[in-house]
Amino acid sequence: MAKLACLFPGQGSQSVGMGLDLQQNYSEAAETFAAIDKAAGRSLSSLCFEGPEAELKRTINTQPTILAASLAAYAAYQKAGGPRPDYVAGHSLGEITALTVASVLTIDDAVKLVEKRAALMESCPKGAMTAVLGMAPEVLEELCAQVSADDEKKCVVVANFNTRDQLVVSGDVDAVAKAGALVKEKGGKAIPLPVGGAFHSPLMSSAAAEFAQTLAGCPFQDAQFPVVQNVDALPSQAAEELKSKLSKQMESPVRWTAIVEYLAAQGVDTVVEIGPGKVLTGLVKKIDRNIKFFNVFDSESLKATLAALNAVTV
């Protein structure tokens, strides 16, 4: 039987104006933005709607605003009659959005966790990240291991397995630069990313430990539907298992390819990306062309998605 998954974006999907159309056209979206502003003690909605872009790009602002825009979009999707997902998943930050829509976290707790996560990631030790195209994951992993072995004080790892040939490495500035040079020597493309931290790498270990302490005091509930998590690309519904895996996420790779492959293996043939941008549906298309994909980021895309989903289920 065909199944549906809802996917939630992470950092990099933000844009000035995100969520504004839904806020203006769906009272549930407006109420969600208001609740998030109250929980944050600041106007995240104004940052979403008006920017400025330079402020929106700061990790401390990017992460909570993407959470806000995504949760508001899901509220509108629910109100408009969007079908209940069989699975949910989120890319990095998006996993916290997924946990919230699955009723694992309250909006208040989700906002507090994301604000803490963003602050820790923005203040983490200086590092670098580089996108790598045209190289098999196992080849890149071996290359990173070789670079790291050359200097025990430097490390570089594969941080994002976005598709089979779209990867991201993360680590010490020098080690990432060396890995990028070797990628080019071997015929691949290496594109430095405009970030100042080594996200999803061992350099995040101290931040991850502090985040785990915050998580320990945060109440989790069992999920209403399975959440396929980043660290192992497997589903969880038990509260403590969800919390344990989330605590490891900040210093572990995002296994997005494996998540999509798992969903397909479980019979998921349709995904809806809910929140700003179309990054995740673009990745899904490259991983499995048999999966139908839709987006919800404004009222027009919501109506088009629901019309298409209703046509599929009739």
Predicted regions and their residues:
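Small/polar (Gly/Ser/Thr/Ala-rich) solvent-exposed segments
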Residues: 263
